[in-house]
Regions:
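Topology signature of small-to-medium multi-pass alpha-helical membrane proteins
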Residues: 1-190
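Exposed alpha-helical structural elements
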Residues: 10, 196-199, 281
């Protein structure tokens, strides 16, 4: 939350440069926010803080050191321009909190969820719209409408244009930051290996969804013991969700251990497992593993009687 606050404050104060002069709330909050002399640097650092806050909230290991370095840079820059021991104490607490939480960061990569993507899209979309509106009124003052002028006008068109450049650079930097956080050599499960899959199905048999596992857009997670494949899951990836098709294939007595191993590996990479088209027996197994479940649709069986055709 502290990182989100710092990032949003820096972006807001750089986007609407006189915001602290027209709002008592921001007059109170301004002394507790990072602030640089350069508007472009304010925007750039603000967006990086927002991006790292997202990574920290998802407990991504690779977000830890960039956050420490960026916070240290912000603190040194700000403290060099202030003598407020109260402010220094607040910054020290924020930095200490991140350091003490370092063991909480265990995920190998950053993966966007639908919810996080929606929130960030709304945040950045509102920022762009607000900046465009501010630029419009900066170029065409709103006549006698002192309220609009008071809130949205920049000191000059140059200030607005410099901010626009900073905004563009910041979004590019944010894109590369997300790319960095999302890169990893660790993968979930295995790719399509026809010989291995066929050998496994011949040994343990299949289920109602096993024919789909030969489609190359499915991934395969093999649970092994002593180097031998024991249980198989077939899945597809959608954002941060891993949709697992039907019951596991393999030794039933090892389903629970295999499911827990699959959960741990998926969580390590930032994915959440979603099971569908599964049996009642496996539903209870998943419930014991901590999953919630809901029933959608019904399964029906029809017996067709063979007889003379009717015209």
């Amino acid at each position: 939350l502290a990182l989100y606050f710092a990032g949003i404050m820096m972006v807001l104060l750089s986007t609407v440069t006189n915001l602290s002069n027209v709002s008592r709330l921001f007059q109170v909050l301004l002394p507790f926010s990072f602030n640089f002399l350069d508007q472009t640097l304010n925007l750039f650092v603000g967006f990086l803080l927002l991006g790292l806050a997202r990574g920290i909230s998802m407990k991504v290991k690779k977000a830890y050191w960039p956050t420490i370095i960026l916070l240290g840079f912000c603190i040194v820059n700000t403290v060099a321009r202030t003598t407020s021991w109260q402010l220094i104490a607040v910054y020290a607490v924020i930095l200490l909190a991140v350091i003490l939480a370092r063991k909480e960061f265990y995920r190998e990569k950053f993966v966007y969820s639908w919810g996080a993507l929606t929130v960030d899209s709304i945040l950045f979309g509102c920022l762009f719209i607000g900046y465009a509106v501010a630029g419009y009124y900066a170029a065409r003052p709103a006549g006698g409408n002192q309220v609009i002028n008071h809130f949205l006008l920049f000191p000059s068109d140059d200030v607005w244009f410099n901010g626009l450049i900073g905004l563009s650079i910041s979004l590019i930097g944010l894109f590369f930051l997300y790319q960095y956080l999302a890169e990893t050599t660790v993968t979930l499960g295995e790719g399509f290996e026809e010989a291995r899959l066929t050998r496994f199905l011949e040994k343990f048999g299949g289920n109602e969804g096993s024919q789909f596992l030969y489609l190359k857009d499915y991934g395969h997670f093999y649970y092994q013991e002593e180097g031998e494949d024991q249980v198989l899951f077939g899945f597809q990836m959608k954002f941060n969700k891993c949709f697992v098709l039907a019951d596991p294939i393999g030794q039933r007595e090892k389903w629970t251990a295999a499911t827990l191993a699959f959960m741990d590996q998926a969580d390590l990479l930032g994915y959440q497992l979603v099971f569908y088209r599964i049996s009642e027996e496996y539903v209870m197994n998943l419930h014991d593993c901590g999953f919630e479940f809901m029933k959608v649709g019904e399964e029906g069986l029809i017996q067709f009687e063979i007889g003379r055709a009717h015209v």
